[in-house]
Amino acid sequence: GFSSLFKAGAKYLLKSVGKAGAQQLACKAANNCA
């Protein structure tokens, strides 16, 4: 389902842009940046 797809995407982001980049993207995606 969507959850497993999201987890796979998160792992891909972590590998490709690094932890900080992935967190920033997730923050923007959630529109919840401090």
Curated annotation (Swiss-Prot):
Keywords linked to the UniProt accession: Amphibian defense peptide, Antibiotic, Antimicrobial, Disulfide bond, Secreted
A biological process from GO: defense response to bacterium
Record bears the keyword Disulfide bond: yes
Protein location: Secreted
GO CC annotation, single: extracellular region
Cysteine-cysteine disulfides: C27-C33
Tissue: Expressed by the skin glands.
Function: Antimicrobial peptide. Active against the Gram-positive bacteria S.aureus FDA209P (MIC=14.9 ug/ml) and B.subtilis ATCC 6633 (MIC>64 ug/ml), but not active against the Gram-negative bacterium E.coli or the fungus C.albicans.
Family: Belongs to the frog skin active peptide (FSAP) family. Brevinin subfamily.
Annotated protein name in UniProt: Brevinin-2GHa
Organism whose genome encodes this protein: Sylvirana guentheri
